[in-house]
């Protein structure tokens, strides 16, 4: 939700196996299931002033994870334009898609298009580290990166 007390930091996922999930990795600053989630303020992609209503998404780490037979997207990360997700680290991550993948929206947010077999999407992130990240079977680009300040990709 919105608010300066809404802080996500040091979120770590490690040694996980997933099968037949829609979008295995997501962090979404425009979540619409809170009471104010569908208001113009929450859903606006315009730069807003940073004030007591501004949440913070800081560090996320995903390591040693296999997600197979996925459907919608390999990942969907979207921070606020005025307060980006500070850091996302993905290390030793493998994503593959189901042959007959279902379509859906990758996150609960207005204005996000339905898709299937989409690659890794990230917008409004200060630092993105992709260390031995494998994505197989996607339709279109493996990486859709927008407004990323620092990107480190290692095979």
Regions found by a protein language model. Name each.
Residues 1-155:
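Extracellular/periplasmic carbohydrate-active domains that bind, remodel
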